């Protein structure tokens, strides 16, 4: 089942934050890990905009940070829709 939920378009996020969400869904749907490194590989705006989008999604419990390793790699997972705030 695809991970993208249409509700994301009704939550008042910036275009950049919605784009981050869609990229996260694309990675998840292709069984790739959602990580800053993987996102930067397909992100076409600034790293600062990516981080702002990630933070906004974390703040609303849409994206959950699962691991930050000693090498600075950060990994996420998508939360279930029922857990969004």
Report the location of each language-model feature.
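Winged helix-turn-helix DNA-binding recognition segment
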Residues: 10-15, 26-77
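Short, amphipathic alpha-helical interaction segments positioned at domain boundaries
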Residues: 80-85
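Short active-site loop/helix that positions an aromatic residue
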Residues: 23
């Amino acid at each position: 089942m695809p991970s993208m939920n249409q509700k994301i378009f009704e939550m008042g996020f910036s275009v950049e934050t919605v784009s981050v969400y869609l990229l996260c869904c694309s990675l998840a749907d292709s069984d790739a890990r959602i990580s800053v490194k993987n996102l930067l590989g397909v992100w076409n705006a600034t790293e600062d905009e990516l981080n702002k989008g990630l933070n906004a999604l974390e703040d609303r419990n849409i994206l959950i940070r699962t691991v930050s390793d000693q090498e600075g790699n950060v990994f996420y997972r998508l939360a279930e829709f029922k857990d969004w705030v």
